[in-house]
């Protein structure tokens, strides 16, 4: 290139697809958000669905209470999907949908809307995440057992390969594995093992046309994570690409080099975003993006960045715009896209890549010896390993071995102007849920019930017979079937599943746990039994990492811990507390639904005569909501800033101690006949 060449004459690679993960409240509100983001330069859509939609419930179901429209948009039927993409031509759009257990259903709704718009299915471009195996390990929005879930994944792949050839039917998601604590080798090996399990399932289907296998392979994409150790992350991505090519040739005999290309999208790490000094998160996000864009041979095809304030709550449109501008500045203002891979020939990079590949091959062999990814998941083997890795990560931060600026080092600083004023987050009104309940009742009242009944019968027949689930799902979408009805009919056929919690291994403590152990031992002597902690995950929030680590550490400092995993109703949590004789209840809610869910738990405790049992709550909780919770009677609130687990254990022990002191004082007042003291019932037990 001539030194005199103008910038306009320089040949540049095409930039990656620029996305923002977005969706909240209603389809109409999310539609406004999408059209606004597209006008700002976004080049693809990434749809966030709320938890009822992701787990196959209608907005008026008991388990949907408090969750409607919180972490994404509520889509209960075809009318909602129609409104979501109003004035957005799907034939021209590249749409990514973060949906897994209900992926066949949401894709069916999308295809029905595309048909209404007159878009040919062959023209549609986009992705359904559809990686159900990782849901058992990290994200928690699974519904059915692994075998039928894998069958549904296969059905989507076979249908789209034939009918929607530009669609990516599955995103193998190592992203969520890193969020659950995975090391680079675990992220590589678990994701590749999942891909192998799915591809083997497709290949072994008796009705599958082997001649089209290379087409299936070429449409499997990945959704990865990138953390702060960005040199290692660059090497991880290069290792991913090389191992994928290796698997394509050696395991599946793919000869077409283009079909062996490792194609992936990315959202950089959210786990490392901090509540303390949240302005530092901007730098973290930008550094992490470099890991998936600098190396041309392993560059992301699509990028979506979290917002700086996601450790505080839901981002506002301005926050998402800021993250989008980071991508645009890197892609269009720098010369990054003018060069071939700038890391080729680096002996440091090559050595690290080879080491990662060797370790990953060894782990893949170990998983294969267990019986493959599905067997390893069902046995709890992979979940236990992730929980242990996450425990080591947390312990390293607690000890100061892993520095996190503003958290365990250089905590003192000036107040951030970014968090002044309105609290720096977006909040979803509680009226959204009531409005959604009204809308779905209206939808049910206006449809043809005979057509709905026939569509559900056809869906059930396909599920039981092994026929592809997509055609009857599309027909059901057009007939007016709801998300909850689709989910319930398949629950009746396949059953529901409870994944292993992984809370079985000895955790790694920071060495500062002795105070907690002594306090708990003293409490045990006073009680005449081991203090009992019930950890609950009310609602549909499947992000269990925090609850798992609390359960691990509490057990290790001496609590008798009960943790039954995700997706519990307030009634179930209170029943478990009564059964176990809990001395303290810990609730973990990361979906923003803490206020209504905790309110209901407290009400159920009062009904059960257990209002004396203290409740503590952990989650992404604003200062305003913390006050609301404490006014409800919550004893303590923990947020991401409370990263020292041993201090939380001391706090839990003191919560039990204060509750015992209060009960002793109340008992003494009752015996003394003090006016206003708690009364005894006929059995002699105190009534609170």
Curated annotation (Swiss-Prot):
Chain residues that bind adenosylcob(III)alamin: 543
Any coiled-coil regions, as ranges: none
Region (Disordered): 666-688
CDD domains registered for this protein in UniProt: MM_CoA_mut_B12_BD (cd02071)
UniProt record similarity statement: Belongs to the methylmalonyl-CoA mutase family.
Cofactor (UniProt): adenosylcob(III)alamin
Lineage: Bacteria, Pseudomonadati, Pseudomonadota, Alphaproteobacteria, Hyphomicrobiales
Entry GO MF terms: cobalamin binding; metal ion binding; methylmalonyl-CoA mutase activity
Protein's UniProt name: Ethylmalonyl-CoA mutase
Superkingdom assignment: Bacteria
Main function: Radical enzyme that catalyzes the transformation of (2R)-ethylmalonyl-CoA to (2S)-methylsuccinyl-CoA. Is involved in the ethylmalonyl-CoA pathway for acetyl-CoA assimilation required for M.extorquens growth on one- and two-carbon compounds such as ethylamine, methanol or ethanol as sole carbon source. This enzyme acts as a regulatory metabolic control point in this pathway, that allows M.extorquens to efficiently restore metabolic balance when challenged with a sudden change in the growth substrate.
Domain B12-binding residue range list: 530-659
Biological source species: Methylorubrum extorquens (strain ATCC 14718 / DSM 1338 / JCM 2805 / NCIMB 9133 / AM1) (Methylobacterium extorquens)
Top-level class of the enzyme under EC nomenclature: isomerase
NCBIfam families membership: acid_CoA_mut_C, acid_CoA_mut_N
UniProt-listed Enzyme Commission number(s): 5.4.99.63
Cystine pairings recorded for this chain: none
Disruption phenotype: Cells lacking this gene lose the ability to grow on C1 (methanol and methylamine) and C2 (ethanol and ethylamine) compounds, and also on beta-hydroxybutyrate, but they grow normally on pyruvate. Growth on C1 and C2 compounds is restored by addition of glyoxylate or glycolate, indicating that these mutants are unable to convert acetyl-CoA into glyoxylate.
Induction remarks: Up-regulated during growth on ethylamine.
Catalytic activity: (2R)-ethylmalonyl-CoA = (2S)-methylsuccinyl-CoA
Annotated keywords: Cobalamin, Cobalt, Isomerase, Metal-binding
């Amino acid at each position: 290139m001539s030194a005199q060449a103008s910038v306009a004459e320089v040949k540049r690679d095409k930039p990656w697809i620029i996305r923002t993960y977005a969706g909240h409240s209603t389809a109409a509100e999310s539609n406004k958000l999408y059209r606004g983001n597209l006008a700002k330069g976004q080049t693809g859509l990434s749809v966030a669905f709320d938890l009822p939609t992701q787990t196959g419930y209608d907005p008026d179901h008991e388990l949907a209470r408090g969750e409607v429209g919180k972490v994404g948009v509520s889509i209960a039927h075809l009318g909602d999907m129609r409104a979501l993409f109003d004035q957005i031509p799907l034939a021209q759009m590249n749409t990514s949908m973060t949906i897994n257990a209900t992926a066949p259903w949401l894709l069916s709704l999308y295809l029905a809307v595309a048909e209404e718009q007159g878009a040919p299915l062959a023209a549609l471009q986009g992705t359904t995440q559809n990686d159900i195996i990782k849901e058992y390990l990290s994200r928690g929005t699974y519904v059915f057992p692994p075998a039928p879930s894998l069958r549904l994944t296969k059905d989507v792949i076979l249908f789209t390969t034939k009918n929607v050839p530009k669609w990516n039917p599955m995103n193998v998601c190592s992203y969520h594995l890193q969020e659950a604590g995975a090391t680079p080798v675990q992220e590589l090996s678990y994701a590749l093992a999942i891909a192998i399990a799915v591809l083997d399932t497709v290949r072994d289907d008796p009705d599958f046309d082997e001649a089209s296998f290379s087409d299936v392979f070429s449409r499997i994409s990945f959704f990865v994570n990138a953390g702060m150790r960005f040199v290692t992350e660059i090497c991880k991505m290069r290792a991913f690409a090389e191992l994928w090519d290796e698997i394509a040739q050696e395991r599946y005999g793919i000869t077409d080099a283009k079909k062996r290309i490792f194609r992936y999208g990315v959202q950089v790490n959210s786990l490392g975003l901090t509540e303390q000094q949240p302005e530092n998160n901007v730098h973290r996000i930008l550094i992490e993006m470099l890991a998936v864009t600098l190396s041309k041979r392993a560059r992301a095809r699509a990028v979506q960045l979290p917002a700086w304030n996601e450790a505080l709550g839901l981002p506002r449109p301005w926050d998402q715009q800021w993250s989008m501008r980071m991508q645009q500045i890197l892609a269009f203002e720098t010369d990054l896209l003018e060069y071939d891979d700038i890391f080729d020939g680096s002996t440091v990079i090559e050595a690290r890549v080879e080491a990662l590949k060797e370790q990953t091959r060894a782990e893949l062999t170990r998983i294969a010896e267990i019986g493959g990814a599905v067997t390893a998941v069902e046995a709890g083997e992979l979940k236990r390993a992730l929980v242990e890795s996450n425990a080591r990560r947390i312990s390293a931060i607690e000890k100061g071995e892993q520095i996190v600026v503003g958290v365990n080092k250089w905590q003192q600083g000036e107040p951030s102007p970014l968090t002044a004023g309105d609290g720096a987050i977006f909040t979803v009104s509680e009226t959204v849920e009531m409005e959604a309940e009204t809308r779905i009742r209206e939808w049910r009242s206006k449809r043809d019930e005979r057509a709905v009944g026939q569509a559900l019968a056809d869906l059930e027949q396909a599920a039981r017979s092994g026929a592809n689930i997509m055609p009857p799902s599309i027909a059901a979408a057009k007939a007016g079937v709801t998300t909850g009805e689709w989910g319930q009919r398949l629950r009746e056929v396949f059953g529901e599943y409870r994944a292993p919690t992984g809370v079985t291994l000895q955790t790694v403590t920071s060495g500062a746990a002795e105070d907690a152990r002594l306090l708990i031992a003293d409490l045990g002597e006073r009680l005449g039994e081991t203090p009992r902690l019930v950890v609950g995950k009310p609602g549909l929030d499947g992000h269990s990492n925090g609850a798992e680590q609390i359960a691990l550490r509490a057990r290790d400092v001496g609590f008798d811990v009960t943790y039954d995993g995700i997706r519990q109703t307030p009634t179930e949590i209170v029943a478990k507390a009564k059964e176990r004789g809990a001395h303290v209840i810990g609730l973990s809610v990361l979906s923003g639904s803490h206020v209504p869910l905790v309110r209901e738990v407290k009400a159920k405790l009062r009904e059960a005569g257990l209002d004396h049992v203290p409740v503590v709550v952990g989650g992404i909780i604003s200062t305003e909501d913390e006050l609301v919770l404490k006014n409800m009677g919550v004893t303590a609130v923990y947020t991401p800033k409370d990263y020292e687990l041993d201090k939380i254990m001391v706090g839990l022990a003191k919560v039990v101690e204060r509750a015992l002191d209060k009960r002793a004082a109340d008992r003494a007042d009752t015996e003394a006949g003090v006016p206003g003291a708690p009364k005894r019932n006929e059995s002699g037990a105190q009534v609170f």
